[in-house]
């Protein structure tokens, strides 16, 4: 019994173990969906005789690890020395608490979040109180692009990256599926009205007639084109899947929350 890893994560884990022989802080940078959480889980399982701490940005990620424990045929009782915490709560951790709680190993899930002003306070206290602690960090995006492009793999792990796989590399190797891009126009009436208004303002009758014919042809093609409902029916094969709709701003998002109900009504 134990934690099974995919081939690419087995290779990464071997590199993690090798690097820990010389370093106290090791990072893994793999894309979302590649199973890097199982690398963390295996490391915690292999060090279950030590005092371990799993830190994550949200309760959802903590709960995900617990689900991984159970899906691996294990129980929380197999991790008697493991504690869980989330960065927001850990930010206010006291020196007194850390003096009474010694940790040998810590996992920093989505470690780029540790660069946040408040959340970093608790992490810094933890590392200062435990200078010899072993730290495993996992992230898909170690660069904080909106924070002066800080590289948290450099700041927290001194560049000790045991394994790094880019999203493009993961797709090329078959670790992640290659997305299929389907294009469709769902909102064109406003543009058609603008073109019609321009045509109506033309004074050259020949040009006016020519552009009107082109616009009429475009309208006919759009009328015969599949709507989003049909496109979704054709290309979404998993009705129970999770889907995300990107919007340009909050106002657009509120508008689209109602609009997308029509898109998905025949799917789920």
Predicted segments — roles?
Residues 51-58, 242-249:
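Conserved RecA-like ASCE P-loop NTPase motor core of nucleic-acid helicases/translocases
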Residues 147-241:
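Interdomain helical connector at the RecA1-RecA2 junction of SF1/SF2 helicase-like NTPases
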């Amino acid at each position: 019994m134990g934690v099974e890893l995919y081939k690419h994560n087995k290779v990464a884990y071997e590199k993690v173990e090798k690097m820990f022989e010389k370093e106290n802080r090791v990072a893994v940078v793999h894309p979302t969906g590649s199973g890097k959480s199982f690398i963390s889980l295996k490391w915690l399982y292999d060090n279950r005789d030590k005092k371990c701490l799993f830190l994550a940005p949200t309760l959802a990620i903590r709960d995900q690890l617990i689900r991984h424990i159970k899906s691996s045929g294990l129980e929380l009782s197999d991790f008697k020395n493991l504690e869980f915490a989330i960065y927001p709560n850990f930010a206010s951790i006291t020196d007194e608490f850390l003096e009474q709680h010694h940790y040998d190993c810590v996992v920093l899930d989505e470690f780029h979040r540790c660069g946040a002003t408040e959340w970093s306070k608790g992490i810094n206290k933890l590392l200062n109180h435990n200078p010899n602690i072993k730290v495993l960090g996992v992230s898909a995006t170690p660069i904080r692009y909106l924070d002066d492009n800080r590289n948290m793999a450099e700041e927290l792990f001194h560049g000790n990256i045991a394994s790094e796989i880019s999203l493009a590399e993961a797709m090329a190797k078959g670790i992640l599926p290659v997305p299929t891009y389907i294009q469709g126009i769902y909102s064109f009436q406003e543009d058609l009205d603008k073109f019609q208004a321009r045509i109506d303002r033309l004074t050259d009758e020949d040009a006016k007639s020519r552009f009107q014919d082109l616009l009429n042809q475009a309208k006919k093609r759009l009328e015969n084109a599949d709507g989003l409902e049909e496109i979704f029916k054709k290309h979404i094969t998993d009705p129970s899947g999770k889907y995300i709709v990107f919007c340009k701003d909050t106002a657009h998002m509120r508008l689209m929350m109602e609009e997308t109900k029509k898109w998905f009504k025949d799917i789920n």
